[in-house]
Curated annotation (Swiss-Prot):
Subunit structure: PSII is composed of 1 copy each of membrane proteins PsbA, PsbB, PsbC, PsbD, PsbE, PsbF, PsbH, PsbI, PsbJ, PsbK, PsbL, PsbM, PsbT, PsbX, PsbY, PsbZ, Psb30/Ycf12, at least 3 peripheral proteins of the oxygen-evolving complex and a large number of cofactors. It forms dimeric complexes.
Transmembrane segments: 21-36, 101-115, 140-156, 203-218, 237-252, 457-472
Full protein name: Photosystem II CP47 reaction center protein
DNA damage is among the record's keywords: no
Family to which this protein belongs: Belongs to the PsbB/PsbC family. PsbB subfamily.
Single Gene Ontology MF annotation: electron transporter, transferring electrons within the cyclic electron transport pathway of photosynthesis activity
GO biological process assignments: photosynthetic electron transport in photosystem II
Cofactor comment text: Binds multiple chlorophylls. PSII binds additional chlorophylls, carotenoids and specific lipids.
Compartments, as annotated in UniProt: Plastid, Chloroplast thylakoid membrane
Domain of life: Eukaryota
Membrane topology of this protein: Multi-pass membrane protein
Amino acid sequence: MGLPWYRVHTVVLNDPGRLLSVHIMHTALVAGWAGSMALYELAVFDPSDPVLDPMWRQGMFVIPFMTRLGITNSWGGWSITGGTITNPGLWSYEGVAGAHIVFSGLCFLAAIWHWVYWDLEIFCDERTGKPSLDLPKIFGIHLFLSGVACFGFGAFHVTGLYGPGIWVSDPYGLTGKVQPVNPAWGVEGFDPFVPGGIASHHIAAGTLGILAGLFHLSVRPPQRLYKGLRMGNIETVLSSSIAAVFFAAFVVAGTMWYGSATTPIELFGPTRYQWDQGYFQQEIYRRVSAGLAENQSLSEAWSKIPEKLAFYDYIGNNPAKGGLFRAGSMDNGDGIAVGWLGHPIFRDKEGRELFVRRMPTFFETFPVVLVDGDGIVRADVPFRRAESKYSVEQVGVTVEFYGGELNGVSYSDPATVKKYARRAQLGEIFELDRATLKSDGVFRSSPRGWFTFGHASFALLFFFGHIWHGARTLFRDVFAGIDPDLDAQVEFGAFQKLGDPTTRRQVV
């Protein structure tokens, strides 16, 4: 046929059988990728330390999505929450991966069958004998079926009525587990961080989809609307489908980047805004203050801070710190976290407690500045020592650790104090193993960052695709050069411009 690469999809125009075939093959490719990727991730995933080396630090992409839907066990005998299990059941990580691969194979065979047997009676209009699809009816069928699936997910899977529930955690990502969720029908259901909204919105949207599907199955579109929106043209279906996909991609890019109940931080890592706002730092200080109010010592209060909470309060877990072209997991960047060294408290020679100013998200380097409780600069690590007034040596800064591995240890020599002051810029201080993976020390993003970038990019691309195909279907007559009001029978090839009698071809 000699089609250019950007026109090859015209081969399935007016060929419903092969149009169906290529869509089934696409589903086979997607399901096959998902299953294969899951098996690859399971082969390289280390489940031994869910606190300091969780799935998002290891760069897992599909495991978090399985986990949030209720899969927690592996045929390898481990559970995502730690510990061992003896009977993981069919719906383990490997079971889901295998199901996708089997489904992919069946779709592959179905696609081949429909490609070979493309000329089926069901695709033909009995009045004309030509291939024809009743697109409004097909729209109604798809709307109804997707409504049933949506309702079923919300009413059965999420609520635990028939299914495991979903991943639910506390606001600080410490106690997450899979559990049934009751629908939230009040105003709280509109809070993106309330899991009950997931159940209620799927039930409501599914009900609406079922009703809308039945409507479109039982009511024919008015002729004027049918013609105006080109409802008989398959490119209209393409355009509106692309619109649905890019809209969904923009929405999930937002819920992933800003955080929501659908993207728990235990599975995808914290958001950048939790670092920007000192979210975990405030909670840590609140817990320490509560401990001190109960007459605990500083050491006791800091020792009760969960290592998991302290680890969230570390800039290396901020998804916005990874560069756009830095491939690899977070562990390949700053290393595998081994342990929390403890919270450093700096003091000058007058006994004032000093706080290291933390590095903002979009800085690669930042001056080491220590301020007192009133925000007044008391010490720093100067760029030019000759002009320094607040150097660690001049001010006599010391550091003492509370909680963690260095609990009760203090340092007064300036070199060590400066080392820990620099590290305190990055939040809580952790020992990181950079040797095992040959980590290069340059921060990487988490799957939260990759997902957002990928979906925002494709959403923009698909937005232009929607405009392109929408314009092609709405203005098809203009592009083809056919007057829509032309009633006369037009002989193809008689005119240079189709249907324009002023351009009759001259016989040479």
